[in-house]
A protein has these predicted regions:
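Low-complexity, flexible helical/coil segments
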Residues: 45, 91-94, 123-125
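Short amphipathic secondary-structure patches
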Residues: 2, 56-105
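Residue-level preference for non-acidic, small/hydrophobic
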Residues: 52-53, 78, 125
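Alpha-helical assembly-interface signal, strongest on the long, hydrophobic N-terminal helix that forms
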Residues: 1-70
C-alpha cells in the first residue's frame, strides 16, 4: 500500500467538495431570490395599504356631495400613490374602498405569474367625516 491514500473508506471522494460547494451556492442563490420576492411583495402590500388609506381620506369630504365625486378623488390619490383602485363605494357617509399594488421587481412578477397568476396584494380602507 502506498503512503499517499488508503484504499479504504473515502477513497472515491475526489471532487465531492466541489459538488457540495456548487449545491450550497445554488441553494443560497435560490434563498436570496425568494427573500427578494417576499420583500417585494411586502413592499407592494404596504404601498396598497398606504394608497387605500390616503384614497379613503381624500374621498371622505367629497362623499358629502356624491359617490361619484368621492370615488373620483379616491381614484386619483390611489393612482398617484402607485396602486390601482379595485372597489369604491359610499356607505352611510363613509368611503369604503380597496386598492391593490403590483410588485415592482421583474422577477417577482415573473415568479407570481409562473405560480398561477399575477399576485397583487390588496388592502381595504374606509373613512368618513363623523
Amino acid at each position: 500500500m502506498s503512503a499517499g491514500r488508503s484504499a479504504g473508506v473515502g477513497a472515491d471522494d475526489r471532487g465531492a467538495a466541489l459538488v457540495t460547494s456548487l449545491v450550497l451556492v445554488a441553494v443560497l442563490v435560490v434563498a436570496a431570490l425568494l427573500g427578494g420576492v417576499v420583500a417585494d411583495l411586502l413592499a407592494a402590500r404596504q404601498r396598497a395599504a398606504a394608497a387605500a388609506d390616503l384614497g379613503a381620506l381624500a374621498g371622505a369630504p367629497a362623499a358629502q356631495t356624491s359617490e361619484a365625486n368621492a370615488c373620483a378623488a379616491a381614484t386619483w390619490v390611489v393612482r398617484e400613490n402607485g396602486a390601482t383602485l379595485r372597489t369604491c363605494a359610499v356607505v352611510d357617509g363613509d368611503v369604503r374602498l380597496t386598492a391593490s399594488a403590483r410588485p415592482r421587481a421583474p422577477w417577482s412578477r415573473w415568479l407570481s405569474e409562473l405560480l398561477g397568476g399575477a399576485v397583487e396584494p390588496t388592502a381595504a380602507a374606509h373613512a368618513g367625516l363623523r
